[in-house]
Amino acid sequence: MRAETPSVLLIYTGGTIGMIENPETGALENFNFDHLLKHVPELKRFNYRISSYQFNPPIDSSDMEPAYWAKLVKIINYNYDYFDGFVILHGTDTMAYTASALSFMLENLSKPVILTGSQLPIGTLRTDGKENLITAIEIAAAKNPDGTAIVPEVCIFFENHLMRGNRTTKINAENFNAFRSFNYPPLARVGIHIKYEPNLIRKPDPTKPLKPHYLFDNNVVILTLFPGIQESIVTSLLHVPGLKAVVMKTFGSGNAPQKEWFIRQLKEATERGIIIVNITQCASGAVEMGRYETGMHLLEAGVILSLIHI
């Protein structure tokens, strides 16, 4: 049986947040999360049961791939009945990718899965890591009066915003406020108090058990359009062996060149069973393929409309 004390499993995949300076060499090294309270003594003030799991060896987030997402899902699924929430410490470069993937892989999720990290190592003087870690743990443990989780979904917490995982993008390589959710408001804002937005938070079906998914098809490419893009580039990309899907980043509200060869290449690809999804290159806004003639040509070629900016 699980104790009444709120319980959080901390999963360290790698990244800047888990680094401390070696006093002898000055080099940054991964610290042992079994000694977490030594490095973040503030956690003692929480009346929580905090356990940790760390990837061995930790990975640079630039090396993140679907196999590691499956590993995270397995860890969460295995421990699902023993913890109230989960905090994943992750490098910032691909954190948004992982958060988005987990939001689909953890079907019927009814507990918080909060990803966070830092721009400065937790062992440096001005680190943002401690605040991010402490707040992420507090959010992961937070419950409503009826005992249900306040935020039962996959999120990213960074600086002072809690954001839906599959709506979040890294926007800055240096600032502490490195992530933003352009097309969906923050689920919580953090200052002196944590101010949740209950009307924006996903409501799970309590009758459905967690349904984990482990398999991803890697045969997907991104086609970013630009003025002057050549037919040879599009042709070679659409004929990659084994290709299953294309995420096509278009102009504005979903517009693309009207050249005959371009539309023909797209149509031939969709007729071969390749899925082509139209998303905008813009940071915010959405695709409206019926708004301009260029968008109508894409629809006729079998391109699928993305309802939101990914």
Predicted regions and their residues:
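Short, acidic/small-residue loops that bind anionic groups at enzyme active sites
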Residues: 99-130, 138-143, 270-280
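CN hydrolase (nitrilase-like) catalytic-core segments centered on the catalytic cysteine
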Residues: 251-288
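Internal gly/pro-rich beta-alpha loop/helix module
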Residues: 115-191
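Accessory alpha-helical/coil subdomains and C-terminal extensions
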Residues: 5, 11-15, 36-44, 164-248, ...
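ATP/NTP phosphate-donor binding region
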Residues: 1-78
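Glycine-rich, charge-decorated loop segments at or immediately adjacent to ligand/cofactor-binding or catalytic sites
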Residues: 121-133, 283-297
